[in-house]
Amino acid sequence: MTADSPIHGSAMLMMNSGRVLSGHPCIGSWANYGLGSVNEDLPGFVVMLDPRGGPISGSKNWSSGYMPATYQATVMRSGRNPILDLTPPSELQGNSQRQLLDTLRNYNEDHFATRSDNSNLAARIASYELAYKMQTQAPEAVDISQETQATQEAYGLTDPKSEKFGRQCLLARRLVERGVRFV
């Protein structure tokens, strides 16, 4: 692979956004913008980080750039628990979590009414709702123990050399099957 820049950080941005400089939407953000998500309980665009660390230029690689922040990626960690805090705290059982989120949304929407040009605030409001919805869909989507032993072997999960990469490939397949447009 080649790029217009010999500098790895700029080349990564070029690969992901088509531009050498940051501030432009990446391809996943464009897909999320143009196609949306098939499943409203899961994000439309997911990034899975390499277990050895994030890429050069970090989150600029999955940024929504000048588009509203709601189109940026949802990051999933590598390993056995790709999404933290999927289970609500014990003190928020029953309807209390929904009531808390509704109150928070009302405050945020009041705040947003005077700052409608702030897409980060709109994205924050949307992310709270998505996180709430993900509590029902995501645990099943990321539970690869439901796959047969043959499938786990085919993805290399039984070999320490390929287990981490295989886990991400299998997780990506499961997410796409459930409506995530871009991984």
Language model features with spans:
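Ligand-binding pockets and gating/stacking loops
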Residues: 1-183
